[in-house]
Design a protein with these regions (language model features):
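Glycine-rich phosphate/pyrophosphate-binding loop and the adjoining helix
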Residues: 2-5, 79-144
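Helix-loop-strand module that forms the ligand-binding subsite of alpha/beta enzymes
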Residues: 1-85
């Protein structure tokens, strides 16, 4: 299915952009299921690769959606690509989103910043700098 195809692509991908429409102030059910399955089955292929997230809404709910999406890159040591504002656009239809000048500008910033970060990573690799090897962290429960 879609997730298995994504896992295969993730093996050779340099970076990721995860975006979703906003449904009831959260990521769409499809995106949530996709991300949960991708993280569980293919998380090791996400590790240390840059990620950008973005959300599109008619009106509101984008910040809670971004908060939901950011959890995945944070869990897998993925450098998070940012811009000068929260990565969101507004509109019910593609042509309406294009009228969101500020949101579209932030999306272009994400693209430029992603390209810059990928160049920095490649330059680092060429000079013997690799990502840290983090030891396995202890797993604890709140109730003992």
């Amino acid at each position: 299915g879609v997730v298995n195809e994504a896992i295969e692509k993730a093996k050779t991908a340099d970076a990721f952009v995860f975006g979703t429409p906003v449904h009831y102030a959260s990521a769409s059910g499809n995106m949530t299921s996709f991300m949960d399955r991708l993280a569980y089955a293919g998380g090791k292929y996400l590790a240390y690769k840059p990620a950008a997230i973005c959300a599109s809404a008619r009106r509101a709910g984008t910040t809670t959606t971004l908060d939901q999406l950011v959890k995945y890159p944070e869990f897998f040591h993925m450098p998070l690509v940012s811009g000068s504002y929260w990565p969101m656009v507004h509109g019910s239809k593609p042509e309406q989103v294009l009228e969101d000048a500020e949101g579209c500008a932030v999306m272009r910033e994400l693209g430029r910043n992603m390209a810059w970060l990928l160049k920095c990573i490649e330059l680092g690799k060429a000079n013997g700098i690799t990502h840290p090897e983090n030891p396995r962290r202890p797993m604890t429960n709140f109730i003992r």
